[in-house]
Every structure is written in C-alpha cells, then in structure tokens.
Amino acid sequence: MMVRASGRPIFQDIRKLSFDYVPERMPHREKQREALETLFRPLLEAHVSQNAFLVGQVGTGKTHVSKRFVLDFEREAARKNRTVRHVLVNCRQRMTDDAVLLAILKTWDERFPDRGFSIPEKLSALRKHLERSHAHMIVVLDEADVLIRKSSDLIYALTRFDEEYEAPRGSVSVVLISQRDVLPFLDPATLSTFRRSNMVEFGKYSQEELVDILADRVKTAFFPDVVSEDVVQLIADIAAEGGDARYAIEILQKAGELALDENLREVNPEQVREARAVTHALLSRESLEGLDRPKRMVLLAIARKLEKKAYVTTGEAEEAYAVVCEEYGANKRRHTQFWKYLQDLDLLGFVVAKPSGEGMTGKTTIISLEDVPAKPLIESLEASLAR
C-alpha cells in the first residue's frame, strides 16, 4: 500500500504502523515470548491446559506478544498433528460475560445467534465445537481487569472447563492481559488456577529500546531516507517518559501523514512536534474506536461541558447528551442507560465520576477529565462520529 507525496513516496506500507499489525520480530520482548513458550509446553507434550497472566502498562507489548505467541503456537501444534485455535477478545469492547462468550463462539460459527442462549447453553455449544474438532482453544482476554471488576464468572468457567464438562477431548487455556495485577481481585476458586509463577511481566520500554522498535517500523512502513535517525530519536525521547511503544508508533504515523499533507519529501522534527500536539497517549485511535457509538456520544457531551470548567454534574452531562443526540440524529437513551454508559466510561478510565462534596445541594455525581485535555478529545470524537 504505497502512498506518495508530490514527486516522492512517503509510506511504503502504512499498514505496518497499524495497531493490528503483528511483526515477526519484537525487539526487547524475547524474554516474555520465551516465558510463554515455557508455560505452554505441557499443553503440547502432555495435553494439559495452561493459564497465564500478562501484566504491564499501556504500550509495553502485551497484546502484540500474545498475538505472536498464539500464531506461532498454532503452527507448532499443527506440526505435531494437534489442532489448536485461539481467539483474542478485548474486554473494553465486550464488557460482559455474555458478550465475551459470544465472541468466542463466533470464531467457530459466525452465524451463532446474538440472543436467545444462556451462558450455560453457550458454554455447552463451545464444548461441542471443541469435541467435534478434537481441538484445544486458547482464549486471550485483553483488558481483562474490566471484566474482573464486574465480578465475572466466565473466567472461572473457562479455567475449570475440563472439570465442568467431564474433560472433553478439546479443552481451554486462558491468557489474561491487564495493565495492573488483578490476581488479588479474583475470587479464591478462580485464583487457584492462576499461579504467581504463571505471571509474565512487561516493564516500560527505555528510550534506547523505543529507538530499536521505531527503527524496525520505519524500515517496513516508509521508503528509504524519509525518516532520519534524528526523527526516530526525537520520537523515542517523547515516548520514553511513559515507555509506551504504541504511543511512539502513533506519533510516527501521524508525523508521516502530516509530511504527506504538506507535500514534503521527508518527515522532519516539526512534523513530530505537531504530531505530539494532536496525539494523546491515553486517547489513541484504538481506545476511542473501542467504544460503541452511544458511549462516544456521551463522552462527547461530557467533554464539551468540561472544555471550560473542571467539573460537571450528571444532570448537566445528560442535558448536553440530549443535544448531541439531536445533532447526530440518534435516539436519546433513558436515564438508567445513560447512567450505565457513564459508569462504563469511568471504569474504562475516560472520565472520573465521584459523589459531590460540600457546597452542592443534595446528592449528585460530579464528572471530570483528569488525564485528558478536552479540546483534542472533542475533535477526535467529532471526527469519529462523522465517519
């Protein structure tokens, strides 16, 4: 996928900067890949289910390493005449047990009905697929803390799958991915299946490590001599505070797009600075696109109210939400549903909702944006809703 500026190509393959792209080579994550391979070796050698827990901050490679691992593991299993399949479910996008289980079943049968089956019935359907295919399934739950904080029973059901269904020929392994250690929040029964020794930790990337990661992406995504070493160093310096490779790659892509828009022959430091100004590490494209449309509309309403003030009440936010619904031709949801959306946005870290303190009449909830500037959030949401 080649993209050209005036007289000179910029992007050789912009897809290599996508969040969905899984590179073969993952600099500075060899240790974590080897740890997963060691943990799951008994699955191939003795047909024993395994569970693992990957923990680390945003942009430290957890999701990419897990994707690379399951793809490689499936190939290795095939060489040993074993059938292993995987599914990766983002729990920010599917926040209930039912939604997660439906996503798992859709990997076996895309026509499986969205409604009409209870969770036990869905688990039974999964068992039948596994038995019929003589397969083992690795279920990767990304952002698993969202599900766990909602008191999920599904993780327990999956980790005890063999016991629940009398050890079917196909069985299930579970990989949990989270930014924080959620083991203390698991109920004792579920916790017993996740040993501390099964935890794989992902530390922040250093500036030098970010340089290596960016250099790899530059080679595959851009044409030669478009991105200099100085530009790579500058982006790594910017992202080094959080050690966030995802943020670094997003700045790299945005800087390239700005150079393209300005008909430049190469990416220069000014495009990097401009890209940083419009790219917030906590509000990546992936995060916003993970929200369904109604939640994005609620978030837009809140952001607009908070552009010039520190806090907004739920009543004020709901009034602004009604205006946004009218603007985008959407049906306004009832207060109960609005409140649920607000709780989800709080749980996901987009807003902070807390009881009002002194100086306010009656009991109400006040909402704030503590980590994200309102203006770029508004612009990103408006662009997203316009698509």
Protein language model regions, located:
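Mid-core helix/loop region of P-loop NTP-binding domains shared across ATPases and GTPases
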Residues: 4-11, 18, 49, 92-213, ...
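Walker A/P-loop nucleotide-binding motif
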Residues: 47-72, 93
